[in-house]
Regions:
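Short amphipathic alpha-helix
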Residues: 13-24
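Structural loop-to-beta junction motif characteristic of Rossmann-like glycosyltransferase folds
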Residues: 116-117, 241-242, 259-267
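Acidic donor-binding loop of glycosyltransferase active sites
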Residues: 93-95, 238-253, 260-261
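Donor-nucleotide binding loops and adjacent catalytic segments primarily
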Residues: 39-49, 156, 163-243, 276-280, ...
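An aromatic- and histidine-rich active-site surface loop
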Residues: 39-43, 95-114
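An amphipathic, basic-hydrophobic alpha-helix
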Residues: 66-95
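Active-site-proximal region of nucleotide-activated glycan assembly enzymes
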Residues: 2, 29-32, 51-53, 112-161
Length: 286
């Protein structure tokens, strides 16, 4: 059996794709990945040899676009959907699993046009526009935040590296796969005080602020473990005793799996303020 996994753009979506791939392999199901040339899809999966095949299409988002550009993007998505239908035929795809994000649109629509089962996983407490649009047509809609709760897919390695923390020696600052300027500034401002207390810093700063943060730590003569992006985030978490983090859903549940105490600072401009509601969901479970 061969299925198509589609979606991405950011690490939150792509982490789910990776979990689904690992689960499918255990069940002897082959997977074709359909993502985008834009976003982080290629950084995550261009060299992933476990996919039967990978396709990175010219799909793009429509957020903050003019009406004309949105119509143009829709027509382009329909064209890419036709390409996806050809992929389905060539690889004998029997079902499509979408994790949302703009890169999921072509294959998701193609699944409907091809009368293939469409499964959707929504990561956040507030559904994205594409997932909301396709939800009525999906064979199954999965969410950890709805009344019919579905377990959130988290890679085994986050559980495997879990431990009980008894003292504060290392703090990890997590701004998400794209980095967060506010958390970067917070980390840099706290760095001298943390050094005085002999607390080491692990800092995911994102690509855009990497050089700036690196130079700042060097000017302070602080040996911080600074990185922009990592496919082995569980190793960074394992070494930390406290996290200060954005509240994207994948990061949130990975931190829970790792049993890492966390102070969440939700990104206030996220669509539908979903990071706030992600974090509030955890608070409400207490």
């Amino acid at each position: 059996m061969t299925i198509a996994l589609t979606g991405g753009g950011t690490g939150g979506h792509l982490a789910i794709v990776r979990c689904l791939l690992e689960s499918a392999i255990k069940k002897n199901i082959e997977c074709v990945y359909i993502g985008s040339q834009n976003g982080q899809d290629k950084a995550w999966f261009e060299n992933e040899v476990r996919f039967k095949e990978k396709f990175f299409l010219s799909s793009k988002g429509v957020v903050n676009q003019s009406k004309f550009d949105k119509i143009s993007s829709l027509l382009h998505t329909l064209k890419l959907s036709k390409d996806c239908r050809e992929i389905f035929k060539k690889y004998h795809i029997q079902a499509v699993f979408s994790v949302g994000g703009y890169s999921a649109a072509p294959a998701s629509f193609a699944a409907l046009f091809s009368h293939l089962p469409l499964f959707i996983h929504e990561q956040n407490s507030k559904s994205g526009s594409l997932n909301m649009l396709l939800k009525p047509f999906a064979t199954k809609f999965f969410s950890a935040f709805e009344k019919e709760i579905s377990p959130y897919p988290v890679a085994d390695k986050f559980f495997d590296n879990a431990r009980i923390r008894k003292e504060l020696k290392n703090i990890i600052f997590l701004g998400g796969s794209q980095g967060a300027s506010f958390i970067n500034e917070l980390a840099l401002n706290l760095a001298p005080k943390l050094q005085e207390q002999n607390i080491k810093i692990i800092h995911q700063c994102g690509k855009n602020d990497f050089e700036k943060c690196k130079k700042h730590y060097q000017s302070l003569n602080i040996q911080a473990d600074i990185f922009d992006f990592s496919l082995n985030l569980e190793e960074k978490m394992k070494n930390a005793d406290l996290a200060i983090s954005r509240a994207g859903a994948s990061t949130l549940f990975e931190l829970c799996a790792n049993t890492l105490p966390t102070i969440f600072i939700p990104y206030p401009y996220a669509a539908k303020n979903h990071q706030y509601f992600n974090a509030k969901f955890l608070q409400d479970q207490a």
